[in-house]
Amino acid sequence: MKALFLIFHGLNPANGISKKIYYQVNALRACGIDTRLCYLNEPNGRKLRMIDSEVLQDYGAGFKGKILKRIEYSSIVEYAKKENISFIYMRSDHNANPFTIHMVHQMRKAGIKVVMEIPTYPYDQEYIGFSRRKLLFIDQCFRRVLAKQLCGIVTFSDYKTIFGVPTIQISNGIDFSQIKLKQQVNDTNKKLHLIGVAEIHYWHGFDRLVKGLADYYDSHPNYKVFFHIVGDFFGQREKDDILPIIKQHKLENYVTLHGAKHGEELDRLFEKADMAIGSLARHRSGITHIKTLKNREYAARGLSFIYSETDSDFENKPYILKVPADETAIDINSLIHFYEKQSLSPLEIRESIRSLSWETQMNKIINSIKIS
């Protein structure tokens, strides 16, 4: 059986979203499905729609290319028909409009089953500013119409229906072969190293931890806590939330901004770390229940971690510290006391999530829509 994994943007091997997409494609292949990946590429300004390493459609450069890549989907439909594709896995880019609706309608007419993944839901609150709200408005006008054309909506949330369509609930998965297990347990008698890895958005709430460190160091403690932030700031808002606190409270020796890291550099930082920091402010974007990929990656590394949302895969795990979903500073003393009680090894933490492999998660979708 043949499938097409369809996304509406480009790929960057160092980017977390791109890694996730590759994991999902490989998982579908591991389930016995001949899966091709359709994505956009822009070498030298030219807009290309790709199928794996082959060019499907060349839209050219300039304004024309920018428009065509957003409205020309007939080449995808024709490819799916020609190649006898029977299943389309489409990753939403919040781009419901007459063109995507027509594309899915044509696929369904050809007998192709189409599901759409919504990576984060709800997502309206993520659109801040007039220009971004304009883009969202188009999606809001057409997303229920698009949803009616689908065989299902894949979600990592606990929502049973989205846009009036039944959901296929899965968890963000893990490709264990791609994530290195932490090899050593560090001496934490005098210091504790925390790590947060993300493209830094306001909903990660890293500012809550930095505020907690400011409060903690105001008492001149002997026990030292360090926070390693690994990733680039998404925008000025995130910089303004974090950088002034570091400067005002003279935390430069305790909060390190590493920028984006991957590969062996990232592995070394995880070896130095003792505990990880998940999202601490998903409530800022209106989300209470979510199954983030980052939580799973931390567990696969073998680290205990903290977060503030509800993640049903981790709620009762002994290596999880839940903090309130509010704007309070993180209590560093409580975090230290929690860590001191930890007894599980990195391997034991990793083994606790074996059921969250990407192959298991993607197989749920296959079974749900009865692909054969």
Give names to the regions the model predicted:
Residues 16, 327-330, 337-371:
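A charged, aromatic-enriched C-terminal amphipathic alpha-helix characteristic of glycosyltransferases
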Residues 140-182:
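Donor nucleotide-sugar binding/catalytic pocket of nucleotide-sugar-dependent glycosyltransferases
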Residues 26, 74, 98, 102-109, ...:
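Membrane-proximal helix-turn-helix segments that form the acceptor-binding/catalytic region
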